[in-house]
């Protein structure tokens, strides 16, 4: 069950304050980190991980992982192929760009043509949480191990590219 966070719209001065004090500095720091990586290595890759529900709005089960690259605009296809291989070889189901193709971060920081890449990774909650939204220790260890493997393989691949 979802809980209401705000029962009414925030006052405009509060919204402006949050944008100025949180949103803008955060995104400036992200861009600065990507610029630094790009300057140093000639490329960068931003991985934006999210938790997703186990079923869509029509109660249809979702894949274990949904990867979004805005329909091949933000990620080198070779990196996408490598991610597909790692995830499916670990025994997980995978979908690309549906129902999540990528959001604000993927769109704003992914420019595959300039070697500043981004990928959105949605992870199905049922892999690491119980139905009561508590941590499933076994599942969370498996997901942590897979994410570590992804990081290691991508680091190695990008270092050699």
Predicted segment positions?
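N-terminal catalytic or cofactor-binding beta/alpha core of small enzyme domains
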Residues: 1-46, 51-161
